[in-house]
Amino acid sequence: MELPIAPIGRIIKNAGAEIVSDDAREALAKVLEAKGEEIAENAVKLAKHAGRKTVKASDIELAVKRM
């Protein structure tokens, strides 16, 4: 896992949880990493299609919209 667990716990608490288990933090981190990689892969394809090596915020935003 590459995402730090503490911010994941804060995300869950910001959603209304009072207490968050380590298992819950790790589970959400795995899901977010998988979705993040999927979005990044699609953004890279969009940048390449546009003839660029640089992935821009607009590539990320479009990749998310296409999901």
Swiss-Prot record:
One term under GO cellular component: cytoplasm
Question: Can you tell me which residues the record assigns to a coiled coil?
Answer: none
Where is this chain primarily localised? Answer: cytoplasm
Q: Which residue ranges does the record annotate as region Interaction with DNA? A: 53-56
The record's subcellular locations are:
Cytoplasm; Chromosome
- Pfam families documented for this protein: CBFD_NFYB_HMF
Top-rank taxon of the source lineage equals: Archaea
- An MF annotation (GO) of this entry: protein heterodimerization activity
- List residue numbers at the site (Interaction with DNA): 13
| Keywords in alphabetical order | Chromosome, Cytoplasm, DNA-binding
Disulphide-bonded residues: none
State how it assembles. Homodimer or heterodimer with HmtA1 or HmtA2. Dimers then assemble into higher oligomers, with the DNA wrapped around the protein core.
Q: What does this protein do?
A: Binds and compact DNA (95 to 150 base pairs) to form nucleosome-like structures that contain positive DNA supercoils.
Give the family per the record. Belongs to the archaeal histone HMF family.
Q: What is this protein called?
A: DNA-binding protein HMt-2
Q: Which organism is it from?
A: Methanothermobacter thermautotrophicus (strain ATCC 29096 / DSM 1053 / JCM 10044 / NBRC 100330 / Delta H) (Methanobacterium thermoautotrophicum)
